[in-house]
Amino acid sequence: MPIGVPKVPFRLPGDEDAVWIDVYNRLFRERLLFLGQQVDDELANQLICIMIYPNGEDDSRDMYLYVNSPGGAVFAGISIYDAMQFVVPDVQTICIGLAASMGSFVLAGGEITKRIALPHARVMIHQPASSYYEGQVGECIMEAEEVLKIRDCITKVYAQRTGKPLWVVSEDTERDVFTSAEEAKVYGVIDPVAVETSSNSPISKLTKS
């Protein structure tokens, strides 16, 4: 049975009594964001709004984006990536569980040196696919051309963010490539792998909020 969104107490400065708000709103106030489902337009718009809203409040405070996603809509993922590059605070990305397809694309888009994966996380990269298989020949050809353009764009971003040659990324993304956290670090999708004993671990950001 679904338990719904948990609620936690929150007290504004100067207030005596706490109010109960859902846990995501509480964490959003601490700039802790979550990509924990398939990427779609609605989720992308929500995350972009949350990233933009505090943009002028305190530029010195990083944002933390926790990623556990099987991927999803290509343009929605690209829009999240682009927003991360243009907000003033650094966006740290943390992979918990799985970052696949557009999930790994967003993960790689975090601030260089601030992209982290938990020790048992998995990362998967591949080329974008098309779900359009029926229709007139002309429409299929136009879509195929668009898919190739998108693939070229995504391949270039992966190459830029990982430091790998473009031809290597192009060959690797011909198929689904699953990696461990350590392998993702070697490939360049992330930077450090989180250490369980570290007092500054990604999860400690949650417990200190």
Curated annotation (Swiss-Prot):
Give the record's keywords alphabetically.
Chloroplast, Hydrolase, Plastid, Protease, Serine protease
The Gene Ontology terms for molecular function here are: ATP-dependent peptidase activity; ATPase binding; serine-type endopeptidase activity
Q: What is its main location?
A: plastid
Lineage top rank: taxon: Eukaryota
A Pfam cross-reference name:
CLP_protease
Protein family = Belongs to the peptidase S14 family.
Role this protein plays = Cleaves peptides in various proteins in a process that requires ATP hydrolysis. Has a chymotrypsin-like activity. Plays a major role in the degradation of misfolded proteins.
Q: How does it assemble?
A: Component of the chloroplastic Clp protease core complex.
Q: What is this protein called?
A: ATP-dependent Clp protease proteolytic subunit
Lineage of the organism: Eukaryota, Viridiplantae, Streptophyta, Embryophyta, Tracheophyta
